[in-house]
């Protein structure tokens, strides 16, 4: 479910809204059951975090299957670069959400107190992503800037 979209107040008042929080182990177990296989057979451990939901993990796996990408042998930086270079985000809206999540995950994995420059880049790109979503700006310039400034490619 994409809860980022605005819902009219009249509709919202007539709906039940369930907020479910899963632990890390619950997310992994649910995903394993949905796949009928271990999640680690599909994904590099770098992609699995405490914030991962079964839906996000399944979307990532489906994306990899459709695009013939082996996520087990690919790291996060390489996957982000591949999505940006191949412009996969232009073909499917769900890929945009995926790449935004991957960018945030990249920063979360690499930001440290000692690296002030990366913390500043993290804040800068979070604001830029928010503005891109809010004002419907061009994603390509955002992703190219991220690739150049952060991934250094």
Where are these regions (language model features)?
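Sensor-1/coupling segment of RecA-like P-loop NTPase cores
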Residues: 1-11
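Conserved AAA+ ATPase "SRH/arginine-finger" region at the nucleotide-binding site
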Residues: 16-28
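AAA+ P-loop NTPase domains with strong preference for DNA replication initiators
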Residues: 25, 32-153
